[in-house]
Structures are given as C-alpha cells and as structure tokens.
Amino acid sequence: MAATDFFFAFVFSFALIFGFSFAGDPYVSYDFTLSYITASPLGVPQQVIAVNGKFPGPVINATTNYNVHVNVLNHLDEPLLLTWPGVQMRRNSWQDGVLGTNCPIPPNWNFTYDFQLKDQIGSYFYSPSLNFQRASGGFGALIINNRDLVPIPFTEPDGEIIFIIGDWYTQNHTALRRILDSGKELGMPDGVLINGKGPFKYNSSVPDGIEHETVNVDPGKTYRIRVHNVGISTSLNFRIQNHKLLLIETEGRYTSQMNFTDFDVHVGQSYSFLVTMDQNATSDYYIVASARFVNETVWQRVTGVGILHYSNSKGPASGPLPVSATDVNHPWSAMNQPRAIKQNTSASGARPNPQGSFHYGQINITRTYILRSLPPTKINGKLRATLNGISFVNPSTPMRLADDHKVKGDYMLDFPDRPLDEKLPRLSSSIINATYKGFIQVIFQNNDTKIQSFHIDGYAFYVVAMDFGIWSEDRNSSYNNWDAVARSTVEVYPGAWTAVLISLDNVGVWNIRVENLDRWYLGQETYMRIINPEENGSTEMDPPENVMYCGALQAMQKEQHHSSATKSMTNGQLILIFSMMMVLLSSFSSFC
C-alpha cells in the first residue's frame, strides 16, 4: 500500500511540474529564441528576425486567466524587448516589454516574462519594441480563447486560420534605421507579406520564384480567420475573392456581426472574421492585402496575394485581383467602416456577464487629454516626431523601477494635456500623471498627412467618435455612449480626430504610442503613470525576482551564467518543484 501511495504521489508531483494544474489557474510555457536567419520573402535574400527559427514566430495559444511564461533568449547582436499589444498585464506593468517599464535584454541573455491573461479573450500579437526590429520580424500571433463555461456568440467554427500581414522592405531594420537617422523618410515599401511570404504571381509585375501563402480549406465549412497587421506604416485592405467576411471580434471584444466584402486593417490592429467556404470550386481564389489611401497605380507592388485552395478545386486562380468596395479617394467614405463597428452588448466576453453591462456612457469625465500629432520636424538638427510638441526620449532607468528605488530626475510628470502652440518642439522624458480610478477622454488629433494608429498599453478604451476637422467640446454630443467597441489600437485619419474613453483602474506606467513604426521610432509616444496613493499591495504587483537593472541601477544587475540548454524557471514553477519535493519526501518517509 505504501508503495502505491508513493507511486501516486510521484505521478501527482510530476503532473504539477509539467503544468497540469489541479487548483488555481493553469499556465502555459514557451521558450523563444530570437535570432537572425536569411530569407527571401520578396525574392531578395535578406536578414530577418526569426523566433525559434520561424518567420513569423510561433503562435502563443492560451485561455482566459491562464498564466503565460515566455522565456526569451536574445541571439541578436543588439538589445531586445518583446511587447504584447492589447494584453492588459493587470497590476503588472513590469511585464509590458517597453523601455519605460523594462530594461532591455542584452545579446546572449535571457529574460522570462510571466503574466496572467486576466479576464481577456481575443486576437493579439507579440513583437519586438526596440530599435525598429519589428521591421525585420520577431512577431507572431497571440490568441486568448474563451473558457469552456463562457459561450461564444456564434456557432463553433470548423477551424481557425491566422493571417499576419504587413508592409515590407527588402532592407533590414538597421538599414531602415539609418535612413530615418539621416533625416529622410523611408519611402514606398517593397511589398506586402502574408504570413511571411510574398505575392502569388497574379500578373507579370510579380517576379518569378517568390514563395506565396496557400491556405487549404474544405467546401461548406466555416473558419474563424484572425488578421493582424504587424507592418511598419501602411494601412492594408484585406479581402478574399468572392467570399464575405463576417466581423465577429476585434482585440478582445465581440462585435455586432456585419458582413463585409473587404476590410481595412490598420497598423497594429487585429480582427476576427467568420468566412464560409460557399463558392464553387472551379478555381482557387485570391487572398489580397493591398495598401490603402495611396496612389494605387504607383503602389501596385505594395500588394500581398495568397491563394485560398478548396480541397476539390479544379484549377488555379487567374484574372485580375478583386478590388476594394470603398473609394480610397474619399476618406470620409472609408471612415464609415470603423464607425460601423459596435460592441455586441448581449454577448459574454471573458466573463459570463454581457460585455455591455459596464455603462461607460453614464460616467462623468474627470479629465480630457488632447494628443496632437504633426508631420516630423527637425529638433536639434535631427528628424523627430512629436505629441503635443514633445518628442519622447526614454530615460536611462525604466520609470516604475526608478520609482521603486527612489531614483530622482529620471523623468518628469508635466506632459501637457493639450497642444502648446506657443512653444517650440522639444525633446523630453515628460509623461502624463494620471489619477487612479479617474475616467478620462483622450482625443487623438492627427494633423499629420498620413493615417496613423494609436495604441495604449494596459487598457482597452471605448472608441466613441471619429470625424474630420479639429475636435471641440461640442462634439461630445455626437459620441456613441451605448455600444462603442472597446479595443487597444485605433485608427486616426489625416486631418481628423478620434475620441476614446478610459477607466483608469490598472495601476502602473503604460505606454501611449503611435503604432506606425517610423513615427514611433522618431519619438511619437509618451507614458501614463497611474499610482494608487493608498497602495497596500493589492493594486500593483511587486517587481519580479528576475527584474533586470540598467541606467542608474546598472550596478545592481548580476551577470547571467547559463548554458543554452538550461531553461529559465519561473517563480511558479519553482514553487511547484518545491511542493513536489515535499510530497516526495513525505511519501518516501511513509514508505520507509
């Protein structure tokens, strides 16, 4: 009997180590090695950033409330951070993966991110946040599934398909950095990739020898298609020839379900659609991601083309590509599409209660921030991009770490809540000092000449209005105060504004940035610091034990000594191992 007890104790402990949780929230673990490989997505050999040798990287697939551990080993020749746009990192900005909250991972070092997907579902991605590296890869999809007890507001699809799309240059990120550092714009991209591959040869303008994406499907089946634009600066129109896209979700919120023939996906955005394979199989069908709001004749090469292949298809796709239904020469017509996106107020989200049960439209606004972007300008002889006349310079010590160790003068809490036209553009480490549990509105005013995407870490905000012109207080009467969708990345058209509402219930330091990589690199960002003055450990987590130190705290950083075969263990895993040892010792004592 004692031997049997010992055996079951061993099995139980073994299961604990390998992630089978009998109590609490489960976890999933990933080991990511980021390194350079040579690839030719547009027919030209170039250096790209792979994750575990893959471009794009592996999918992170988890479920609401799961704990996610990602051990990142940096095999690049420069510092690295990974960030997780849209993952809210509740109480835990230490894991956000941007310079304001994390010290970079040096070459040949590793760092383990450890975060919980608290009360979230939906479609997201991960990507590098430093040194323009996203322009060379290092990205992949991040999927958060519903728990079994929370129903989805549509029939379970027959399968899932992920499309990672984005504009692409045949120069790597270091060459593109040099162009921006020299004071020049990047110019037109060399193409668009779909899942890391170039265009199908749909006409003679496409060179021979380019590998394209082919998606195999079965007739009559319905698939959930997740689309992520991880590109540099180009808004893309996504469409599948002769197939309707039924919009169901964006960045963690189920939407009112609407059919589209094509859909604009802006830089940094993620969407889910249901697509039914209801066409005849006389031929394959084109999958297209093409540049928007540009001269399409000049930008013809900036088009990604893949193939949708029915299992009973009788021939290849041929003929011209399907065109977008929206007139790109009239941006106000295109704006009607995002205006039509509404929250499904009767659907459950991450919890069983309806998404619309939080009545944001009935809460008084405590503060308004108008964040204005302009075309890049020269500051101290260098090309820079600004918000409210400030081009952000990251402090040498991450801000929350500086707070924790009482480092003075690292940053300033004086970011203006509206443009200061009387002041010249300047460089600064100025951030927003926001009030915990406040309810703010942020107006993104885009006075640049290009469409932009704005993102706020740590939060989902309600997109209540967008329009052309200059925002003013009297526009509040046009807000959608009932079923606005909540998301983390929103488009702002040139010469236009977008208004969002945010409930400040997540303590930490959170990045506010433009997702267009060229503008972000040039300084178009800031941070929002939200501190609970009565902090007692319940609203913000302590720094992790593996926190890295840099800047004024560099002397606190210990050297890493590890072999490539050694996997980093998280605190949770160490606790499980300790528990296993205790169980084994106890059982062994009884056995003896």
UniProtKB/Swiss-Prot annotation:
It holds the Pfam family Cu-oxidase. One of its GO terms (molecular function) is oxidoreductase activity. A lipid is attached at S564 (GPI-anchor amidated serine). SUPFAM superfamilies: Cupredoxins. Residues 1-23 form the signal peptide. Glycans are attached at N61, N110, N172, N203, N259, N280, N295, N344, N364, N433, N447, N476, N536. Its cofactor is Cu cation. InterPro entries: Cu-oxidase-like_N (IPR011707), Cu-oxidase_2nd (IPR001117), Cu-oxidase_C (IPR011706), Cu-oxidase_fam (IPR045087), Cupredoxin (IPR008972), CuRO_1_AAO-like (IPR034273). Residues 565-592 form a propeptide. It is a lipid-anchor; GPI-anchor. Keywords: Cell membrane, Copper, Glycoprotein, GPI-anchor, Lipoprotein, Membrane, Metal-binding, Signal. This is Monocopper oxidase-like protein SKS2. It comes from Arabidopsis thaliana (Mouse-ear cress). The gene is SKS2.
